[in-house]
């Protein structure tokens, strides 16, 4: 009967490791031939303890975070970036990007990390643009946004504006916000200028011109951009309405004060009893003071605001 393999020391027990890390703890490289070690790729292994005592894996991202951590230990110039960094930070992404299982890394040196499922890009990343999230060295949320402006990201222009808006303060929306990743307009533009010339910089500057603070959801961003695509002016965001005496009224998603038009996106958060009460109060105030409330749904966005635009244009024509 074959003898059971010698136990691995605590740093490698139930972990992903490299040959160098095996050497560091004084264990023979032949140990990887045992049945409890899985080969993940060239020089990369995972230990599967026979007693089931492996620590729980991090599963909040669609790629193997333990493999990522090991690669970052092996390559100190590597950082998690692009779509993978966006996933770590919880930035709003289209469905296909949320589930992208490739591990995106940026390296400073010419030698790429050639492994299945790993996409590497060679570019310099300023230390000021690095953060530690979930134990992984990542590009900061702002740097991640601008890196994603490269055509290779696969994201559309609207997707990028959604991310930029999501990074902005959203304090006017009770119970909504991204917490630790919220920053100000100046922070976003400052990092963009620090990066200088890079692939996608023109698109990044166009995103910066259209990003807005105070946006409550990705759908509100897409509504604003759809209005712009339809040839209408950019509406005010998180607008505070006032009556004829200048007394402040409700705060609304989008507004055209010149034509007294309010545009509200009706998303999931409007289904709570408390929010419905606020919506009724807002609509009554608007009706009393001559403001038209136009509500937009997910179907309207899918249809390109086909049923919304005639209402807005009729209001504008009547006010001319």
Where are these regions (language model features)?
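Surface segments flanking catalytic/ligand-binding clefts of nucleic-acid enzymes
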Residues: 1, 10-16, 21-29, 171-320
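Short gly/ser-rich loop at a beta-strand->alpha-helix junction or flexible surface loop bordering the NTP-binding
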Residues: 1-200, 320
């Amino acid at each position: 009967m074959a003898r059971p393999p010698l136990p691995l020391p605590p740093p490698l027990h139930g972990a992903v490791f490299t040959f160098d890390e095996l050497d560091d703890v004084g264990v023979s490289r032949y140990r990887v031939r045992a049945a409890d070690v899985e080969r993940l790729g060239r020089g990369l292994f995972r230990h599967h303890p026979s007693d089931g005592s492996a620590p729980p894996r991090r599963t909040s991202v669609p790629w193997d975070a333990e493999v990522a951590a090991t690669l970052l230990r092996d390559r100190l110039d590597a950082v998690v970036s692009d779509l993978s960094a966006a996933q770590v930070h919880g930035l709003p992404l289209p469905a296909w990007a949320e589930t992208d299982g490739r591990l995106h890394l940026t390296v400073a040196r010419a030698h790429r990390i050639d492994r299945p499922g790993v996409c590497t890009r060679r570019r310099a990343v300023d230390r000021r643009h690095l953060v530690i999230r979930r134990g992984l060295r990542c590009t900061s949320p702002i740097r991640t946004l601008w890196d994603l402006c490269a055509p290779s990201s696969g994201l559309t222009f609207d997707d990028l504006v959604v991310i930029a808006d999501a990074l902005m303060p959203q304090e006017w929306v009770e119970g909504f916000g991204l917490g630790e990743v919220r920053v100000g307009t100046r922070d976003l533009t400052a990092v963009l200028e620090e990066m200088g010339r890079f692939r996608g910089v023109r698109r990044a500057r166009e995103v910066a011109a259209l990003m807005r603070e105070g946006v409550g959801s990705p759908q509100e961003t897409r509504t604003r951009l759809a209005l712009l695509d339809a040839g209408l002016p950019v509406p005010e965001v998180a607008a505070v309405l006032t009556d004829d005496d200048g007394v402040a009224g409700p705060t609304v998603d989008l507004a055209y004060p010149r034509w007294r038009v309010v545009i509200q996106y009706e998303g999931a958060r409007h289904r709570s009893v408390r929010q419905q009460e606020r919506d009724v109060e807002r609509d009554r105030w608007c009706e009393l003071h001559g403001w038209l409330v136009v509500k937009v749904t997910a179907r309207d966005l899918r249809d390109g605001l086909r049923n919304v635009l005639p209402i807005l244009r009729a209001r504008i024509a009547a006010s001319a």
